[in-house]
């Protein structure tokens, strides 16, 4: 699963497993 998180105008994308924080 791909996730994209934007923090303080910075976009961080990555690929996680089935478990999510």
UniProtKB/Swiss-Prot annotation:
Keyword hit for RNA-binding: no
GO molecular function, one term: metal ion binding
Enzyme class per UniProt: oxidoreductase
EC number: 1.2.99.-
Cofactor: [2Fe-2S] cluster
UniProt key word Iron-sulfur: yes
Cofactor binding mode and count: Binds 2 [2Fe-2S] clusters per subunit.
Taxonomic superkingdom: Bacteria
Keywords: 2Fe-2S, Iron, Iron-sulfur, Metal-binding, Oxidoreductase
Subunit structure: Heterotetramer composed of an alpha, a beta and two gamma chains.
Function noted in UniProt: Active with aldehydes and formate esters as substrates.
Descriptive protein name: DYE-linked aldehyde dehydrogenase, gamma chain
